[in-house]
Structure formats: structure tokens, C-alpha cells
Design a protein with these regions (language model features):
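Conserved alpha/beta-hydrolase "acid-adjacent" motif
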Residues: 242-247
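Serine-hydrolase catalytic machinery in alpha/beta-hydrolase-like enzymes
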Residues: 92-182, 270-275, 279
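Glycine-rich nucleophile elbow surrounding the catalytic serine of serine-hydrolase chemistry
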Residues: 9, 190-203
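Catalytic active-site module of serine/aspartate enzymes centered on a nucleophile-bearing elbow/loop
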Residues: 267-270, 275-299
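Catalytic histidine neighborhood in serine/cysteine hydrolases
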Residues: 255-270
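Short beta-strand/loop motif that positions the catalytic acidic residue
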Residues: 229, 235-237
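Alpha/beta-hydrolase fold nucleophile elbow
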Residues: 180-193
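PRPP-dependent phosphoribosyltransferase catalytic core
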Residues: 21-86
Length: 299
């Protein structure tokens, strides 16, 4: 993309560079360019788009009413608003099984948030998907993941095996590190119920994890690993979820990382009350953007 073409030399160089970096499809888009130059670019690009294609052009600026400079940030904002997130069903090898997940990456993602749900839930949970959509809108990638296979979910011992769940979460994190589109993105965890304990335990063993959010979680089940966690951690609990709230207060006192405990008034364990899940999603988005964008994961 350019503000216009004259000789087209810089666009040819850009197209060739994109090919050298492995681009499978190169599209050139300009508001104006000489017809002959556009035809020549057809040999370098898969598609060439132009609003105006005069036979000759002396200066690009003559085709503009206002040829003032446009900041790169403004261009990125426009492209980001217009682009759709990529969505992919994935399979991750871990502990001799294959875990199924849904990976969504918005353009210019700030990082990838891996979801660890609790017992009785799944990656298809409407609550998890609602939070994921809010994170995607905030330029955060999401991996909704089932940490157990369908057969394992019937085994209550595995459902509450925090060590196993944490190991699976760590395997998914390593898998993201091998993908071209996620390898350079920082990682964060969003855990619910027992999934929060798995997220904290996995983060305790991996200082590269930048941030954690627990929704109605059981961080107490992470035990002694709580004091080892370095990632900034946000604990969100419903004000009417009395037992879990007390467990979170106890867990918060064991954390040595930067952390906050936020209570959502009127909310019960599943945040089913009107507007309460939206509050969780907004808090999570702000927490992740703050710590992923700042690059200050461990403190």
C-alpha cells in the first residue's frame, strides 16, 4: 500500500521483499498510478488495485486535495478496525493425548491469552467465549482450550488434578512458542474455577508468563506454588460467592507478585447476573493490556 505511484520502483522492492519473507499472496493497493506502471507491477504482485490509472502522472500530490502527511499510527488504526481476526481450530499434543482448542488472533495482537476453564465447563462455554470476544476486541489473541479429552472429563480425579492441568497448560504455551504467528507474542492466562489454580501453578514454573486473571477461581488449590508466581495476578470474585471469596482472600495473602483482588457486587459464582460478566471481561482486558503492552510481566 502506498499513497500513489510514479515509477513504481519502491513498490517493486516492497513486493519482492514480501515474497522473500514467505508471503503466499502479494496485493498492491494505491489511490493513483500510471497505467503502464500498474501493468508492470502485475508481474510482481498477485493483484494490483488502483482508484485512478491515468496514462501519465507528473506528481502524486497533484491528485490530492490534501497531501499532508498521515501518521503511521493512524494508518494502523484504520487497518486494524477494518481487519477481521483470524480463527483456527487447533490440536495440541500433550502428555500422549491431543487437546482441542480454538485460536483467535486479531490483527496486531498485543499477546495471546490462554484460557483454562474449570470443572463442568469447556472451551465452548458461553461465558468463556463472551470474555474471549471482549479480549479480541481489545487486540488480544485468545486460545480457548480443553485441557482434558472427552474421555478424561468423566474421571473426577483428573478433573481436580491441578498438576496435570498445569502441565497441559504449559504444553499449550510451548506450542504457541513454535508457531510463526504467535512465537513473538507474550503469553497470559485466564483461569476459571480449578483452571485458575492450574494457571497459577503453570505460571509459577514459567516466568515468561506475563499476566494472570482468575474469574471465580480456586487459587487456593495452587498451594505452595502461589508464593513462586511472578506474573501480575488479578483475582475477580463475585460479592455473593462467599466461600470462594474467602478462599481468594487467603490465596491473595500468599501471593508475592503484584496482585489485586476485585469483588463484583451482587455477583454469584458464575457471574450470571446482568452486567457482571461484562465487568469481568472489561477488568481482564484492561489488566492484560496493561501488563502485556508494558512488557513488565515479572516484577
Amino acid at each position: 500500500m502506498d499513497d500513489g505511484l510514479a515509477t513504481g520502483a519502491t513498490m517493486v522492492a516492497a513486493a519482492r521483499w514480501a515474497r522473500s519473507r514467505g508471503a503466499s499472496r502479494v496485493v498492491v493497493a494505491v489511490p493513483v498510478g500510471p497505467a503502464a506502471t500498474l501493468r508492470a507491477l502485475g508481474r510482481e504482485a498477485d493483484d494490483v488495485l488502483a482508484v485512478e490509472a491515468p496514462e501519465t502522472i507528473f506528481a502524486v500530490g497533484e491528485w490530492y486535495g490534501d497531501f499532508g502527511e498521515v501518521a503511521e499510527a493512524e494508518v494502523e488504526a484504520v487497518l486494524g478496525a477494518a481487519a477481521e481476526p483470524s480463527e483456527e481450530r487447533v490440536s495440541i499434543a500433550a502428555d500422549g493425548v491431543h487437546l482441542v482448542g480454538d485460536l483467535t488472533l486479531p490483527p496486531a495482537a498485543l499477546g495471546t491469552v490462554v484460557f483454562a476453564h474449570g470443572s463442568g465447563s469447556s472451551r465452548r462455554s458461553p461465558r468463556n467465549r463472551a470474555v474471549a470476544r471482549r479480549l479480541n476486541a481489545a487486540s488480544l489473541g485468545t486460545l480457548l482450550l480443553d485441557l482434558l479429552t472427552p474421555g478424561e472429563e468423566a474421571d473426577r480425579a483428573r478433573v481436580f488434578d491441578i498438576e496435570l492441568l498445569a502441565d497441559r497448560l504449559s504444553a499449550a504455551t510451548r506450542w504457541l512458542g513454535f508457531r510463526l504467528d504467535t512465537a513473538t507474542l507474550p503469553i497470559a492466562y485466564f483461569g476459571a474455577s480449578t483452571g485458575a489454580a492450574a494457571a497459577l501453578r503453570a505460571a509459577a514454573a514459567d516466568p515468561s508468563v506475563r499476566a494472570i486473571v482468575s474469574r471465580g477461581g480456586r487459587p487456593d488449590l495452587a498451594g505452595d506454588h502461589l508464593s513462586v508466581v511472578r506474573a501480575p495476578t488479578l483475582l475477580v470474585v463475585g460479592g455473593r460467592d462467599d466461600v470462594v471469596l474467602e478462599l481468594n482472600r487467603g490465596a491473595a495473602s500468599a501471593l508475592r507478585c503484584p496482585h489485586e483482588l476485585v469483588v463484583i457486587p451482587g455477583a454469584t459464582h458464575l457471574f450470571e447476573e446482568a452486567g457482571t460478566l461484562d465487568q469481568v471481561a472489561d477488568l481482564a482486558a484492561a489488566w492484560f493490556r496493561r501488563h502485556l503492552a508494558a512488557g513488565d510481566g515479572a516484577a
